[in-house]
Amino acid sequence: MAALSLKGVRKSYDGKQHVLHGIDVEIADGEFIVLVGPSGCGKSTLLRMIAGLESVTDGEIAIGDRVVNTLEPKDRDIAMVFQNYALYPHMTVAQNMGYGLKIRGIERATIDSRVAAAAKILELEPLLARRPRELSGGQRQRVAMGRAIVREPSVFLFDEPLSNLDAKLRVQMRLEIQRLHARLATTSVYVTHDQIEAMTLAQRVIVMNRGYAEQIGAPVDVYEKPATVFVAGFIGSPAMNLMHGRLSEDGASFTVAGGGPALPVAGAPGIGREIATGRDWVLGVRPEHMTPQPGVAQATLPVDSCELLGADNLAHGRWGDHDIAVRLPHADRPARGTALAAALPAHRLHFFDPESGKRAG
């Protein structure tokens, strides 16, 4: 195992197309980090640079006490798990898991021992004699993880490994990856566009956007205190409600742009200090914090639709130019055209600068 250090890491093509813009992060020995963001944000490129599959334009990547910028992938002491499994169809599970060690000249007894140990961890022992065509998608992905485990690397790299699985298998494999990390405690970097994977697997999340690390932090901190409008809108399902508008001079109300209502916001942390009054802001509040509740400031939301999500409902309406969602208990299903008393708890309100997109307060 080893720590992983990224210092000022940049990537560009032909000096013109800039893909990554100075990524700085220190990943502790044994830490599980998730790179999450939309397509084209640079997360997979960064993973490939750590693996040695892409060159580093500028900056430094170090694994343990070695700078690895110019090292070949085979010399970096890493193991990768890919989206497409990449198993040899003519080999058995055991042969697939041990093949990387075989071509490195590792003796047979060591290979057999490592394969047996990994198979036990991943509950693959009954499948060792089977070939990939005889396995389910989840079993194939476990074989791919087993192939990585037997290498006993300093760092695991996961490139969207669950993307090809159905919803039920993704849940199962998330749990297996959590258990695997708890058992092995190997430094891990995991790439995904799926925020549920990011929030459930990570010890820290790196939210990527257009080649920048928008925010780095524990999942709960990123969720509860997003650093930018982008993070607020990307992390969370459904996304945070974000409204452009103007904060009154006395800081008591926020008028939503596009003819929306004046919302009660008095008492929100930072108003009159970091959050200047009498100017434009972007106001954010999560749907689950708008569930009607007694003793909390409220505003009327005309309901135009309601989605049944199983355990709860999601009511939709509009304030001015903005679509608004409110999470409701399973028993509350307002009809179209009804008025919903949406809560606006002061301590749950977020303000962002409309120009920079950065959080205030």
Curated annotation (Swiss-Prot):
UniProt-listed CDD domains: ABC_MalK_N
> Where exactly are the transmembrane stretches of this chain?
none
Q: Which GO terms describe its cellular component?
A: ATP-binding cassette (ABC) transporter complex, substrate-binding subunit-containing
EC?
7.6.2.10
Q: Where is this chain's protein located in or outside the cell?
A: Cell inner membrane
Residues forming the ABC transporter domain are 4-235
**Catalyzed reactions:** sn-glycerol 3-phosphate(out) + ATP + H2O = sn-glycerol 3-phosphate(in) + ADP + phosphate + H(+)
Could you list this entry's UniProt keywords, alphabetically sorted. ATP-binding, Cell inner membrane, Cell membrane, Membrane, Nucleotide-binding, Sugar transport, Translocase, Transport
First-level EC class: translocase
| Complexes and interactors | The complex is composed of two ATP-binding proteins (UgpC), two transmembrane proteins (UgpA and UgpE) and a solute-binding protein (UgpB).
Protein's name in the database: sn-glycerol-3-phosphate import ATP-binding protein UgpC
